[in-house]
Amino acid sequence: MAKRHLTRRQSWRIEKIQEERAARAARRESRAVEELEGGDLGPEQTGQVIAHFGVQVEVESADGQVSRCHLRANLPALVTGDQVVWRAGNQGIGVIVAQLPRRSELCRPDMRGLLKPVAANVDRIVIVFAPRPEPHANLIDRYLIAAEHAGIQPLLLLNKADLVDESNAEGIDALLNVYRTLGYPLIEVSAFNGLAMDELRGALDGHVSVFVGQSGVGKSSLVNALLPGVDTRVGDLSTVTGKGTHTTTTARLFHFPGGGDLIDSPGIREFGLGHVSRDDVEAGFIEFRDLLGHCRFRDCKHDREPGCALLQALEDGRIMPQRMASYRHILASMPETDY
């Protein structure tokens, strides 16, 4: 069925209804918190948000106990991965009283273009792609820009490596060679037959990771293989579009048996870059960094200007044509006000 396109007024009405519902839920939560704080609460302790359910979160204490908690009204928006201070209640429901500083946060624009955190304290972004649906360098580069902008180490992961055959091997190899040449860590695995899964486990050990990538690349299947017994509801590729059906619904943090954590967040079909500037995009292309600021003109657009350091590097072979094309495509997709 074709996607329904809403008018601006319809979108506004939907947002208004959602805001009113959220406000009513917040008032109910505020009353619940007041009732809890009026009773007996335990001492303050630190914990980590391992799941978010709108107006409530699940918090794991230092000893591994998990509790459902209400949120104080004066708290900033919490996301999975946040470290918090909380107090346990006498009926199994606690209260979050403070958010501890974040070491990092992964953000993306919401439907209105406002920046919204989706995970906190992540130190590794695993960018998952697969032979099917067909991988596109432009989408991978968008994720890399987001990772560089957030200061989070990326790991490129080709899943479904068992689907590489004579029909797609040449294109897949060419794509992988681009990122190997740039020095990005890259692993080829198969959640289906277990290929290189131990190598992946070793790369994830000791890190807080989040998997990103378009639907259908097998993120949930990877989670199920890495964490046996954890069901994240795997969806099949759509027979009509060839794209994946979105199945994971709630961001949740899992512990790997050998150490390290995984935040499994809802599938993202295409990661938006509305929150970054032209300078951020340029900085996200790591091979540009030593060249930026060396053009003849300070306002160089790296298009056809004489004395452009990037164009000279492209001519000399220090910048790959695929990467320059991807850079230009990403800039063309951004609002002109961000240039």
Swiss-Prot record:
Signal peptide start-end: none
ATP-binding is among the record's keywords: no
Q: What class of enzyme is it?
A: hydrolase
Q: What does this protein do?
A: One of several proteins that assist in the late maturation steps of the functional core of the 30S ribosomal subunit. Helps release RbfA from mature subunits. May play a role in the assembly of ribosomal proteins into the subunit. Circularly permuted GTPase that catalyzes slow GTP hydrolysis, GTPase activity is stimulated by the 30S ribosomal subunit.
Q: Which family does it belong to?
A: Belongs to the TRAFAC class YlqF/YawG GTPase family. RsgA subfamily.
The protein's matches in InterPro entries, at most eight in alphabetical order, are given as:
G_CP_dom, NA-bd_OB-fold, P-loop_NTPase, Ribosome_biogen_GTPase_RsgA, RsgA_GTPase_dom
Its Enzyme Commission number(s) read: 3.6.1.-
Name of one Pfam family that matches = RsgA_GTPase
Compartments in which it is found:
Cytoplasm
Q: What's any GO biological process attached to this entry?
A: ribosomal small subunit biogenesis
Q: What is the protein's major site of localization?
A: cytoplasm
The protein's superkingdom reads Bacteria
CDD domains in the record, alphabetically?
A: YjeQ_EngC
The entry lists its GO molecular-function terms as: GTP binding; GTPase activity; metal ion binding; rRNA binding
What cofactor is needed? Zn(2+)
What protein is this chain from? Small ribosomal subunit biogenesis GTPase RsgA
**Species, as recorded:** Pseudomonas aeruginosa (strain ATCC 15692 / DSM 22644 / CIP 104116 / JCM 14847 / LMG 12228 / 1C / PRS 101 / PAO1)
Which residues bind GTP per the record? 159-162, 213-221
| Residues the record lists as binding Zn(2+) | 295, 300, 302, 308
Assembly notes: Monomer. Associates with 30S ribosomal subunit, binds 16S rRNA.
Q: Which GO terms describe its cellular component?
A: cytoplasm
All copies of domain CP-type G, residue ranges: 111-271
Q: Does the keyword GTP-binding apply?
A: yes
